[in-house]
């Protein structure tokens, strides 16, 4: 009865998602963030629907993984999920002015001078795309 708790995507790696739903409900979580055991929520939309039915009114199933403006409405209508999660991210250049390209702070194939950031236009596009979805 305190703060709401969302169980993150670990359920997508479970042997039995429906058994996991029961365990997660028993633990008192309010939501489960999941792609429906698939590589994306779009691919897992049918499983998301089954998971939502299994969770019933005990928990909210949040569709996550590859959600964007082009597929959000379809994911919602196919899965029955009324909440979605999207990273809406884009790669942006680092603000570093001096760059020593001969040194790497990690793996050599990692771009040291960029980062991922939320793309406000993608967020707006997703919100606009789902604005007419009936509840």
What are the residue ranges of the model-derived segments?
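Generic recognition of short, well-ordered alpha-helical segments
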Residues: 18-19, 43-46
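A polyampholytic, Gly/Pro-enriched intrinsically disordered region
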Residues: 26-31, 108-109
